[in-house]
Swiss-Prot record:
Pfam families for this protein: Rib_5-P_isom_A
Protein name: Ribose-5-phosphate isomerase A
First-tier enzyme category under EC: isomerase
Pathway(s) annotated for this protein in UniProt: Carbohydrate degradation; pentose phosphate pathway; D-ribose 5-phosphate from D-ribulose 5-phosphate (non-oxidative stage): step 1/1
Job of this protein: Catalyzes the reversible conversion of ribose-5-phosphate to ribulose 5-phosphate.
UniProt family annotation: Belongs to the ribose 5-phosphate isomerase family.
The keyword DNA-binding is annotated on this UniProt entry: no
Annotated source species: Aliivibrio fischeri (strain ATCC 700601 / ES114)
Subunit structure of this chain's protein: Homodimer.
InterPro entries in the cross-refs: NagB/RpiA_transferase-like, Ribose5P_isomerase_typA_subgr, Ribose5P_isomerase_type_A
Underlying gene: rpiA
Length: 218
């Protein structure tokens, strides 16, 4: 199986967690795009979706799936999203696609988080993939200096503005052994909107597309 075929297998496997009559939380990225294709086969059985990005919203609407505003729902049964890295505790680095804040919000209102990845995303220690931090523009330099104090090497993601109008710092060179503690420390910095560590709200179920098929961890 190619990497894209493994992503597709994981995306379609997540369909079993979608219940008829529900509103589904939908994440962002190449693996999620396969899930959206799968979800379209159930579009007449579900009420619709809450999306974590403009890109996913556009794809959902193109396929005829109604998209609800996050503020108009009290909660979601399930949220399906990918990850840039995930460890054995189902803690993740997310935000390579710059949608981390909205992803974290949709995850927070969902009862169950289904993470879908190919097997290249599984790691023992988080941090080889640069850790994204969404920052209010005027705080960029200050936050970068503070991230250096925390042991990171931050780089401004030039030319990228988030759906919320903010900028991204990608933090290189970190071996994250205590993800919850680092999530707290970075989120406490003035000017940080959120960090792409999903440790306090990790995945409940992990579906991994692998050469031998889809593996499930929960």
């Amino acid at each position: 199986m190619t990497q894209d075929e493994m992503k597709k297998a994981a995306g379609w496997a997540a369909l079993e967690y979608v219940e008829a009559g529900s509103i589904v939380g939908v994440g962002t990225g190449s693996t999620v795009n396969h899930f959206i294709d799968a979800l379209a086969t159930m579009k007449n059985e579900i009420k619709g979706a809450v999306s974590s990005s403009v890109a996913s919203t556009e794809k959902l609407k193109e396929l005829g799936i109604e998209v609800f505003d996050c503020n108009d729902v009290a909660g979601l049964d399930v949220y399906v999203d990918g990850a840039d890295e995930i460890n054995g505790k189902n803690e993740m680095i997310k935000g390579g696609g710059a949608a981390l804040t909205r992803e974290k919000i949709v995850a927070a209102i969902s009862d169950k988080f289904i993470c879908i990845v190919d097997d290249t995303k599984q790691v023992d220690v988080l941090g080889q993939f640069p850790l994204p931090v969404e920052v209010i523009p005027m705080a960029r330099s200050y936050v970068a200096r503070e991230l250096v104090k925390l042991g990171g090497d931050p780089a401004y993601r030039e030319g990228v503005i988030t759906d919320n109008g903010n900028v991204i710092l990608d933090v290189h060179g970190m071996k994250i052994t205590d993800a919850k503690d680092l999530e707290d420390k970075i989120n406490a910095l003035p000017g940080v909107v959120t960090v792409g560590l999903f440790a306090h709200r990790g995945a409940d179920v992990l579906l991994v597309g692998a050469p031998e098929g889809v593996k499930k961890f929960d």
